[in-house]
Every structure is written in C-alpha cells, then in structure tokens.
UniProtKB/Swiss-Prot annotation:
Belongs to the WD repeat TAF5 family. Disruption phenotype: Larval lethal in 2nd instar stage. RNAi-mediated knockdown in female germ line cells results in arrested oogenesis at stage 6-7. GO terms for cellular component: nucleus; SAGA complex. WD repeats lie at residues 389-428, 493-524, 535-576, 577-618, 619-660, 661-702. This is Protein will decrease acetylation. It is found in: Nucleus; Chromosome.
Length: 743
C-alpha cells in the first residue's frame, strides 16, 4: 500500500489552509477600500453615539466629506447667519419654566436703566424694547407660561408705543363662564397718535406686538407668517458704540443672564458710528433683492445710511456714491458748452420747483392734521330745556329719536308731551315745526279742532279764578323763552292713578312707555295718543324702565326687590330677575341686548343674562344707593352713580372697578355716553352738568383716593351751572347734541 504523495495532496483537504487563504483574500479586498469610507464609518459611529442622527443606516449622501471652495464658502456663510441646530447654548426656556417672574424682574430693571439715560441715548436704547419684548413673550409661551406672557406684554407694551386702553375688542363671552383665564385672549391696540410717526421700524414692532397679543399658545403664534419670519433668524439692529458700551457695562454689573442670552441668540447688533440703517418695510420683511457684494468697499457704498441727530430725528445721509458723483474727475475739462450750461440751469430750476411742491404738500398736510385735531378736541355746548312744574313734582323726562318732542312724567300721575319749538301748543292742535316734517308724534292743525279747543278753553277760563286765568293768558301769549315748557302747553296723558316715576320714547316703534307707583306700566300710541296696553305683574311701585336695543322687550325695576322682562305682546312678565335685598332703582340693557344691569338701594350692581335670568356679575364697590346706570356704546364699560358724589366705571370683562369720577357737588341724577364712546355726561341734582373725557382715564391703583382726586381735573372737559334748580335727564341725540332737561 502506497501512501499519498505530499507534493500533490499536501494541502488539498486541509481546512486550516483553506481559512488562511480566505483571510488573505479578504485582507486584499479591504486594502482596496478608500479612506473616505473609513472616515465616514468613524464619523457615523461618533454621531450615533452622540445621538446626532436618527437613522441607523448611513448613506454616502448623508456624510459628504469633499467640497469645493464655492460650496465651502456658501456653507460657511449659512452657518454664521443661521442658528445651529446641534450646537448647545444656554436656554432661556429652561430657566423661566415655573419662574416667569425672573423675566419681569430683569426686563423691568432694564427699562428703568434705559429711562434714566440722557435723551439721545434713551431714544436709541428704546429700539431694543420691541425685539426683546416679543422674544420674551414667545419664550414664555414656549415654557408653557401663558399667564406670565400675557402679564409681561400687558405691563410693558407701553414702552414700545403709547397703548390705547379702551380700543381693544371685548372677549367673545362677557360672562366668562365657558372660557378659563388661561385660554382667554387679550388684544393690545396702540394709540392713533403713535401710528402716524412714519417710523417703519416702530410700525413693524407695533403690528408684531398687536399680532402676538392675540395668541396665548405657541403653536397658534408660530402659524402666523409675521411671527414665523420674525422668529426664523436674528434681527439686525444698527446702533452706535456708545449705546453698546453702556448696555454691556450694565449687563456685566447686573448679571441679567436672560437678557444677555436673548441678545446673543436673537439679535445681531451692528455698530455704526453716528449712523444707523434706514429701515424700510421690505428690509424688515426680507423682501429686498439686493445682495451683499463680495468686496467690503462695495458693501459700504451700496448700503444707504441715515444720520441720528440729538433730537432723535432720523435724516438720510449722503451715500458715498452720491459724494463721488459730485466730485469732478481730473480728466474732465473745465470749459463747458452753452448747451450744457442751459441744461444745468434747467435741471436746477426743476429741482427747486419739485422741492417747493414738496414743501407746499407738507404744509397742506400739516394744516389738515392740525384742523382735524382742533375739531376733534372742540366740545359742543349742551342745550338746556327747562320745564315749569309748579309743584307738580317733575320725576322724569325724555326726548324722542327725532329730537322734536319731549315727554315728562309728574308726581301728580300726569304725563305731558311737548314739541321742541318756540311756539306754544293748545290741546291736541300741535303746530308743525317744518311743513314737510315727518314725525309720528306730530299732529296736523285743524280749524275745527282749534275752534273746539278755543271754546273749551273759554269755558275753563270762566270756571277758573282770576289769578289762574291771568296765568293761562300769560302762558298762551308767551313764546316759551329760555326753552321753558309749562303745564299749559303740550298735551297731557291721563291714565295712571298714582305718581309717574319714569317715561321713555320707543326707539323702534311709534310708542312711548310710562311706569308709575300704581305698579303698572302703560304703552301709548302715537297716532291717537291713547293707552294701547297696561302691563301688570309687579306688586309694588315701579321705579324705572328701559327698552331693549333690538326692540320687542322692556325691562322694569320695582320696589318688590326684583326686575322683570316684558314683551309688548303679553301683559304679564316673561322673566323675573330676583337677587337684590332692597329696591331696584335703575335698569339698563346692554348694547347687544343679551344682558341687563340692575342697580339697587342695597349698594350693589348686578349683571344678568336677559334670556335665561342667570346672574353673571356682581359689583359691590358702591357705598350708597345706585340710582343711575349707563353702558358705553361699545359695551365694554358700565357707569354707575347715585346718591354718592362720584361715578364708578366698571370693566365688564374683568368684573372689577376701572376708575372713579369724583368732584361732583351733589348726587348724580342722570348719565349719558356720547355716540363715539369718548365723553360721559353727568347731571347732578343741584343743576350742574359735567363732561368727562373717558380716553384720559387711568386704571385704579391701590391708593385710589389720591389717584382719583388728582385725575378728576384732567379728565373733566366741561363744567356748566345751568339755570335749572335740578336736572332730571341728560340725553345724546342722533345729531350728537347733548340735551339737558331740568326744572
């Protein structure tokens, strides 16, 4: 037996030798792989360990290691301009979470530092308010602190521009039952004077603050295009080196970390000596097409600049291109042709004419604005109407919507109607004020009626005494001087069995209403002056009434401690509003018709839902009986007055007292708001009238007594001592004329 040959079969079936051969082949294949693959794998493993990538598979396009010079320059520029997503920075959100008072404290101290500077520096530093306030607001929303964000914006919005406190729209639901405090929105509106400055940067941040005030959730705010653009990159701010040095020294001394991080993260401060950039709306919104040049000199030449003078006015400065164009080159000859001289003269004349036209237009605009301001500040004097009562006891009065007739109620159960002209009326024969006047309360004169009334009056003259007959004749032949109306003019309506407490013309129908101490309400028609309906539901005297702004409904207040809602089609009350502990002295409908306010002798004002009778608000700030109520035309405020010598104004949305109007000499007998929601007229029982400017109101502070007394003279526009012993009603007509009725 022969053994196998070593030379032929030495390593044929040996598994060891076969593995060694495979390893050698794999090693040769690994040597062929490039260095980029090795680096890519190493970088991928490092990024995976640091959790910088989310995918497990690495592609070649994910880790591109080779770039040309142009791509490297572009990426470098993007890295410097954009905020790096993987870079770790100090986060304001982590600090202000559950600690929103830190933002208020640091921003408040920064504002005190700015306001303490000199005038030029203060005007320049105030430009930091807008971006800082907006970014702090968004950071607080991101930290889930909406209440702190709302308080911060509401507290410091006036630093950006003057805020108009009462131009903000009301919340969607006045009762506030279905929305919580965190979900309720507020809106900031800046004053009209601040919107006419012509400063593009200021207008941009005013619009941004107004937009942010409507959002209390970060997701909703970031969905807005303006907010998203503002938050997408750093805001470029041009200022002087003095301002930057002052702010840096202050931050180093105080150590306000939140402000320093905000300036580092969201602001790009560019120092320009004695110059700053002229911001336009396109620059602020990033809509310009101009690109920065590669050379530094071209960049300086292409940028327009403006000069900041000591008063803070921004004036455009001459660019380097304009200066270079005005320089005469050395190669240009000094000899000019006659045609060139004529062309230069013509261009100079046209430039002067254009400047003159611009000056004329500016003067006309200034004159127009000044005229508008004068007319706006001018106050029209009121018109006084005096009723001679002769111990009849005048209790109430009112004017019709056409302002041509007057209605009065007396304590002797009489209701009397006059027309507002200087001629007297006898019986039902009303003299027409104008031939083509259309008024439902005005009747045509008839000869037969005049003869009948003459005969009736002659019979009455025979029955009356000589003194009464002399008084009648004097009243008939008199022209009612000084707008005085007595019992012999007009037409008397009889029906109540006790004294009349309140009367009212209907604003929607040719009707009028009257309530009396006999616990009834009567409705009178215009075409025949007869009683159309009698409404009975109260058990005690009725003191007041008011008609719904949408018609069909009337509300009354009574001595039975309740207010009741009536429909003109039913003789019994629909809803009873019970809750007061004493007489309901006054009632008022909200301008939208959905709410009713009641004032009582129990020193409280209550707000009710008109349809359900549910109690919405209780204002218990009054110290004496409330006898007068008046809603503002926009429905945001409620004025209450009575036996106190002050008027209290309540904010319906907040459910708290907003301000007080003092300086009254007696109890207030009537209130009335102007149609444009600017003035409030108050009439006193001693015959004095006061007009208040509501736009100048300031919110009540902790020491409200001192603040209210000091602001009383500034808010008061007009004080008039009428010839009446007492005023019973003030009324703004459709012609915006203020009528005052007294006796």
């Amino acid at each position: 037996m022969s053994l196998p040959s070593a030379s032929n079969h030495a390593h044929a079936a040996s598994p060891v030798y076969s593995n060694s051969n495979n390893n050698k082949s794999s090693a040769s294949s690994k040597k062929t792989s490039s260095k980029n693959d090795l680096l890519r794998c190493a970088v991928g493993l490092l990024l995976k360990q640091k959790n910088y990538v989310s995918n497990e598979r690495f592609r070649r396009s994910d880790f591109l290691l080779l770039q040309n010079k142009q791509q490297f320059a572009v990426n470098k520029m993007l890295d410097t301009d954009l905020h790096g997503g993987n870079s770790f920075t100090f986060s304001n959100v982590q600090v202000i979470t559950n600690n929103q008072h830190t933002v208020d404290q640091q921003f408040g101290r920064f504002s005190q530092f700015v306001e303490a500077q000199a005038e030029p520096l203060r005007l320049e530093m105030k430009r930091f308010y807008g971006p800082m306030l907006c970014h702090f607001y968004l950071d607080l929303l991101k930290a889930r602190e909406p209440r702190g964000a709302v308080e911060l914006l509401r507290k410091y919005a006036h630093l950006v521009a003057p805020v108009d406190m009462y131009d903000a729209p009301p919340p969607t639901k006045i009762n506030g039952c279905s929305t919580t405090a965190n979900e309720s929105t507020f809106n900031i509106r800046f004053a009209k004077e601040a919107q006419d400055t012509g400063d593009t940067e200021l207008d941009y941040f005013m619009r941004l603050v107004q937009t942010l005030s409507g959002y209390t959730r970060l997701e909703a705010a970031e969905s807005d295009d303006t907010v998203a653009h503002f938050r997408s990159s750093k805001y470029e701010l041009h200022t002087t080196a003095v301002v930057v040095n002052r702010i840096c020294a202050y931050l180093q001394r105080r150590g306000h970390v939140l402000i320093m991080n905000l300036l580092y993260t969201w602001l790009h401060v560019h120092i320009v000596e004695n110059e700053q950039r002229a911001f336009s709306e396109d620059h602020l919104l990033g809509l310009t097409d101009d690109l920065e040049g590669e050379d530094g000199e071209d960049d300086v030449v292409s940028k327009p600049a403006v000069t900041l003078n000591t008063r803070g006015d921004i004036r455009p400065s001459k660019s380097l291109t304009e200066k270079s164009n005005r320089k005469r080159p050395a190669e240009e000859p000094n000899i000019m042709l006659e045609t060139d001289i004529k062309q230069e003269v013509e261009t100079d004349e046209s430039a002067e004419l254009s400047k003159l036209q611009l000056n004329i237009d500016a003067c006309l605009d200034t004159l127009k604005s000044a005229t508008e301001q004068i007319l706006k500040s001018q106050v029209e004097l009121p018109r006084f109407l005096r009723i001679s009562e002769r111990s009849r006891g005048l209790t109430s009065a009112h004017l019709d919507p056409s302002e041509c007739h007057m209605l009065a109620g007396f304590d002797n159960s009489a209701v009397q109607l006059w027309q507002l002209n200087q001629s007297y009326c006898r019986g039902k024969s009303f003299y027409r004020r104008y031939p083509q006047k259309r008024c439902p309360w005005e009747l045509n004169n008839c000869a037969n009626q005049e003869e009948e009334t003459d005969e009736d009056s002659s019979d009455e003259d025979v029955k009356c005494s000589e003194e009464e007959r002399r008084e009648r004749n004097r009243a008939r032949h008199c022209k009612y001087a000084d707008n005085s109306y007595n019992e012999y003019g007009g037409f008397q309506l009889r029906g109540h069995t006790k004294g009349v407490t309140d009367v009212r013309f209907s604003a929607h129908y040719p009707l009028m209403y009257s309530v009396s101490k006999d616990a009834t309400m009567r409705c009178w028609r215009a075409h025949n002056l007869h009683c159309a309906a009698i409404y009975r539901s109260h058990n005690y005297p009725i003191w007041c009434l008011d008609e719904s702004p949408v018609g069909q409904y009337v509300v009354t207040g009574s001595k039975d401690l309740s207010a009741r809602l009536w429909s003109l089609e039913k003789e019994h009350a629909l809803i009873i509003y019970a809750g007061h502990t004493q007489d309901v002295e006054c009632v008022a409908f909200h301008p939208n018709g959905n709410y009713i306010a009641t004032g009582s002798a129990d020193h409280s004002v209550r707000l009710w839902c008109a349809t359900s009778g549910k109690l919405m608000r209780v204002f218990a700030d009054c110290r004496q009986a409330v006898t007068q109520l008046a809603f503002s035309p926009d429905g945001k405020m409620l004025a209450a007055a009575g036996e106190e010598t002050k008027v209290r104004i309540f904010d319906l949305a907040a459910g708290a007292q907003l301000a007080e109007l003092k300086d009254h000499s007696a109890s207030i007998s009537s209130l009335s708001w102007s149609t444009h929601n600017r003035h409030l007229a108050t009439a006193c029982s001693d015959g004095t009238l006061r007009l208040w400017d509501i736009k100048k109101l300031s919110p009540m502070s902790d020491n409200s007594s001192a603040g209210s007394s000091s602001s009383a003279t500034t808010n008061r526009v007009l004080t008039v001592n009428s010839s009446c012993q007492r005023l019973v009603d003030v009324f703004y007509g459709t012609s915006k004329t203020l009528y005052c009725i007294g006796t």
